[in-house]
UniProtKB/Swiss-Prot annotation:
Species annotation: Caldanaerobacter subterraneus subsp. tengcongensis (strain DSM 15242 / JCM 11007 / NBRC 100824 / MB4)
Domain of life of the native organism: Bacteria
Full protein name: 2-C-methyl-D-erythritol 2,4-cyclodiphosphate synthase
Biological pathway: Isoprenoid biosynthesis; isopentenyl diphosphate biosynthesis via DXP pathway; isopentenyl diphosphate from 1-deoxy-D-xylulose 5-phosphate: step 4/6
Keyword Metal-binding belongs to the record: yes
Lineage: Bacteria, Bacillati, Bacillota, Clostridia, Thermoanaerobacterales
Amino acid sequence: MGKMRVGIGYDVHRFEEGKKLMLGGIEIPFEKGLKGHSDGDVLIHALIDGILGAAGLGDIGEHFPDTDVAYKEVDSKILLKRVLELVSEHYVVNNVDCIVVTERPKLSPYKDRIRTSLAELLGVSKERVNVKAKTEEGLGFTGREEGIKAYAVVLLEERY
């Protein structure tokens, strides 16, 4: 086993009318989506930050600035693919553990699909991907149903 490196990612986006809600690379049926320069996939953005952090390569904003029109409305899966290509020479993903915080929509019916999507995107078995859904019981930004936040812990393993 190679050396291990851990990273933590975080992201938050507010809800916006007229947009699709993308989480972990899949569309979740809901009356609002997430505002963002890209498609607003808060979970993939947190995952990207975790991967970059584990590899010591900064954060998502350094690689994909929201001032760059090239990333306007971009599919976050494309950004994740680019980050994986960036780290693949030296690292492989060992496992990821993610938390999505939202009052609504309830994510239990979609967690398995999100895990499958993330595993496929990361090129790992589904057993190496965990997704938890939490509420804040009416407290704060997410509790007031203003948006969604996500956290991701990523363990990278150094290639031999």
